C-alpha cells in the first residue's frame, strides 16, 4: 500500500443509453473478469424486463429501488479502553450508493432465477416494492445501528 497521499477518485462516465452515472456504476458492479459488454447486456436486458413487467420507466424503478436499498446508518468498530464497540455512524453519500449497488448485485446473484438478467430485474422490482434480500440487508444494518445507539457518543 502506498504511503503517499490517497489515490484520486476517477470520474465515472454516464452510460450511453440512459445517460446516467449510477447505471454505469451498476454495470461496473455486475461485470466479471473485465467483460463490460456482457455486463452491459445483462443490465440493459434487465431494464427491458422491468419496463415490460411494470409499464414504468426502468430508470425510475431502479432509482426508487436504490432509494429503498441505500443505508443511512451503519456500525463501525471502534476500540476504546481494550474493548471493541460497534459505533453507529452516518453513511457518506458516495458510500451509500456503493453499498446499495453492492447489496443489490449480491442479492441478485444469490437468487434462484435462471439467468442473471432475470435475477437482477426481479431484485430491482422487489427493492422498488420495499421487499427482497437487498432491502432486508439495509433493514438489518439499520437495526444493528439502532441496537448500538448507546455507543453513539464514541463517534469520531
From Swiss-Prot:
Biological process, per Gene Ontology: translation
Function: One of the primary rRNA binding proteins, it binds directly to 16S rRNA where it nucleates assembly of the head domain of the 30S subunit. Is located at the subunit interface close to the decoding center, probably blocks exit of the E-site tRNA.
Keyword tags: Ribonucleoprotein, Ribosomal protein, RNA-binding, rRNA-binding, tRNA-binding
Source domain of life: Bacteria
Gene Ontology, cellular component aspect: small ribosomal subunit
Disulfide bridge partners, by residue number: none
Pfam families membership: Ribosomal_S7
Lineage, uppermost ranks: Bacteria, Bacillati, Bacillota, Bacilli, Lactobacillales
A single GO molecular function term of this UniProt record: tRNA binding
UniProt record similarity statement: Belongs to the universal ribosomal protein uS7 family.
Binding partners and assembly: Part of the 30S ribosomal subunit. Contacts proteins S9 and S11.
Gene3D superfamilies the record matches: Ribosomal protein S7 domain
Name used for this protein in its record: Small ribosomal subunit protein uS7
Amino acid at each position: 500500500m502506498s504511503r503517499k497521499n490517497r489515490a484520486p477518485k476517477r470520474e465515472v462516465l454516464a452510460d450511453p443509453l440512459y445517460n446516467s452515472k449510477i447505471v454505469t456504476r451498476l454495470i461496473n458492479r455486475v461485470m466479471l473478469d473485465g467483460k463490460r459488454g456482457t455486463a452491459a447486456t445483462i443490465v440493459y436486458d434487465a431494464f427491458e424486463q422491468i419496463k415490460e413487467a411494470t409499464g414504468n420507466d426502468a430508470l425510475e424503478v431502479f432509482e426508487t429501488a436504490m432509494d429503498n436499498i441505500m443505508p443511512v446508518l451503519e456500525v463501525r468498530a471502534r476500540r476504546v479502553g481494550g474493548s471493541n464497540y460497534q459505533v453507529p455512524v452516518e453513511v457518506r453519500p458516495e458510500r451509500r450508493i456503493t453499498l446499495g449497488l453492492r447489496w443489490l448485485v449480491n442479492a441478485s446473484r444469490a437468487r434462484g432465477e435462471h439467468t442473471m438478467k432475470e435475477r437482477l430485474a426481479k431484485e430491482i422490482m422487489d427493492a422498488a416494492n420495499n421487499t427482497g434480500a437487498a432491502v432486508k440487508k439495509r433493514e438489518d444494518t439499520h437495526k444493528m445501528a439502532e441496537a448500538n445507539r448507546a455507543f453513539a457518543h464514541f463517534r469520531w
